[in-house]
Amino acid sequence: MYGADVLFRGRRVVTPDGVREACVHVVDGRIERVAPFDDVPTRVPLVEAGDRVIFPGVVDTHVHVNEPGRTEWEGFETATRAAAAGGVTTILDMPLNSIPPTTTVDALREKRSAAEGKAHVDVGFWGGAVPDDLGHLRELHDAGVFGFKCFLCPSGVDEFGSLELEQLGAAAAEIAAFDGLLIVHAEIPEPIERATRRLGDADPFAYRTYLSSRPPEAEKAAIAAVAEASAATGCRTHVLHLSAATGLDDLARPGARMSVETCPHYLTFAAEEIPDGATEFKCAPPIRGAENRERLWEALRDGRIAAVVSDHSPCTADLKAGSFFDAWGGMASVELGLRVVWTQARARGFALEDVVRWMSEGPAVIAGLERKGAIVEGRDADLVLFELDEGSEVDPAGLHHRNPVTPYAGRRLDGRVRATYVRGVEVYAEGRFRDEPAGRLLSKGSA
């Protein structure tokens, strides 16, 4: 006999067919039915959304957790608590900034062991494609990573080397042989080196100096090279954290299998507004001008950009000290990404369904997370109850990641996550977390 374990009922439920009244029936952590609003069996626990919207949990495929090895920066306990508070139900952890980086099967096992019992949301893992491990990527693929990250410029940490363009082609061919996914930090070093030499004694504390040191040409040339490698090998390839809108022109190379993401900070801030010395805004690629920002929004509108993810890359406060060239480049934003994007999207006439497409569905499709990203029968019951119109200013002391450093401090954001559910289990509600972490560690092919 059919029987749901828990029901979620709301007047505004975001499904692939649009926003509708519905009652979502959950059995064994999966969505069994998306039923009419009044289809409510008796004696089954019922979560009433009221005026809140129910939508599929955010899938953030670009998170640096840094554990093991740099746990003073972040860790699985704090990163996944922050994720849950931000409506994120699945994260994929990047292979670098942990020690060791996830470039071998042994390193993957060590990272999974470090995460065991600490995950408040589901966690999967990317592998790394670095020069020393080319030729052995199939082993890491078979161990369950969702794809392979590489850099075409220095990564910022010594233990994760970058690839030359010839090595990029070799990695793409190797990954294409097992239909894997290559994800790329797409900046090449030569334009950066030339621009840096031209700066001479320009003020290193001025944001315009840092911006000039990483010109759009570095991204555009890298994306062209990545598209060429994809077309030559048939490798599925994804461009990470697109900043320069000019790079979009090179994605449509015939024969290339390409996708691209951008991040909340590129959709929110503009170079003209960043004060000198404000290194909390430093990231790579850099935040560019307002005109460029609006071109990224147009690419979201027409579908050329398929995903918006956080690139959560935290560090301790002391590492943000000094000039823009001394400070660590990265932002801690996994908890804020949903509200940031909703705030900016609604101001430009987008609907919440658009945000769900960019932040839940799109990342899940790109990473091959077949059970995630949509309120559909058979998917995991990863759900968020969201208040659209309630807003608040960001107080860094109230955030849940390890170090309260954020460029969003004092900024007013729309929306509020009221509750987050992973496979139908409440992991966050009204500022409180489940005592026992309910997240699982995911492997490619079983998620």
Q: What is each of the regions a protein language model found here?
A:
Residues M1-P56:
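Histidine-rich, glycine-flanked metal-binding segment
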Residues V105-V121, L168-V184, V340:
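Alpha-helix-loop-beta-strand connector modules within alpha/beta enzyme cores
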Residues R11, V24, G29, D51, ...:
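Divalent metal-coordination and catalytic microenvironments
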Residues R52-K118:
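Metal-associated gating/positioning segment near the N- to mid-region
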Residues P204-A225, A229-G234, E280, R301-V308, ...:
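His/Asp/Glu-enriched, well-ordered alpha-helical/loop segment
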Residues P68, M94-H120, W126-D133, C150-D158, ...:
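Active-site loop-to-helix "anion-binding N-cap" substructures in soluble metabolic enzymes
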Residues R11, S323-D326, E377-L442:
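C-terminal cap of metal-dependent C-N hydrolases
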Residues G135-C150, P154-V308:
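Histidine/acidic residue-rich metal-binding segments in metalloenzymes
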